[in-house]
Regions:
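Bulky hydrophobic segments
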Residues: 2-213, 220-264
Length: 264
């Protein structure tokens, strides 16, 4: 058991740079501070419970470490730690800035910005997942196909997030979708013209619908921007991180071993 724990941390430190570890723990530390401060001082918040949201997203900040608990050949175990540089920031912006600092209601368009960034992040994670899948099955793949797959996965992830928000609001009394016109109007000082929305809302009854449609439009925009970036810079399919080259080397080593075994 002791050796297993030792090897677990050894694998993590071997794959991650010191800069990455500092980055992760800086964001995690701020999240812990926000949770403790909210519990001790009982901050008011217009939306869902910030403690629950921050604690759940704090766990999400350990995604890479959790992935390392999977069996060695599992594709989750094969994910690069690079993905957590982005996901940790996403969780931080959504929970610490959004829930703890209440940016969702006091910063115009904050939720919309996060939706664009979130789907861009989802496409990025999808790209890493495709690369991990290649490593698992030892199959090469042109970067054009890999990036197209990542786009599809990104939209699946963003749709899953919308389902999560709906479920949380519908069955647990939350405001994850920020559908509450009353909260938005209160934050705007009672002036409907000061409520930020991507589309004009002439009827308060359409506020929630227009908010969700704005989210979907920006999901689309953010996802395609990241897709374009990955098409231009397919970093997992060129240079030192080229998974295709790694797979071809492994195939060559296997053939060499088979040849040597056959000639003995």
């Amino acid at each position: 058991m002791k050796n297993a724990v030792k090897n677990y941390f050894k694998n993590i430190f071997a794959e991650c740079s010191k800069v990455e570890l500092v980055w992760w723990w800086l964001l995690r530390g701020l999240m812990v501070f926000g949770i403790i401060d909210t519990i001790v001082n009982g901050k008011d918040y217009d939306g869902s419970n910030p403690v629950i949201q921050m604690f759940a997203n704090l766990l999400g900040m350990f995604a890479y470490e959790i992935c390392q608990l999977f069996p060695k050949k599992n594709r989750m175990r094969l994910l690069s730690p690079r993905f957590q540089n982005i996901t940790a920031l996403g969780f931080f912006l959504g929970s610490f800035c959004g829930a703890y600092l209440n940016f969702y209601y006091i910063v115009p368009g904050f939720d919309k910005i996060l939706h664009a960034l979130g789907t861009a992040e989802a496409v990025y994670i999808g790209y890493e997942y495709v690369a991990a899948t290649q490593l698992k099955f030892k199959k090469t793949c042109p970067h054009q196909i890999a990036t197209l797959c990542s786009l599809g996965l990104g939209f699946v992830f963003s749709s899953a997030w919308e389902v999560f928000e709906f479920t949380y609001d519908q069955f647990f009394g939350g405001d994850a979708q920020h559908w509450s016109y009353a909260n938005a109007l209160k934050t705007a000082g009672g002036d409907p013209s000061k409520i930020f929305n991507l589309f004009l809302v002439s009827d308060p009854m359409r506020f929630a619908l227009m908010d969700t449609m704005g989210d979907i439009v920006l999901n689309f925009v953010g996802g395609f921007i990241m897709y374009a970036i990955l098409c231009i810079i397919p970093y997992r399919h060129k240079g030192k991180g080229d998974v295709n080259a790694k797979i071809l080397r492994e195939h060559a080593e296997e053939r060499k071993s088979e040849y040597e075994a056959a000639t003995v």
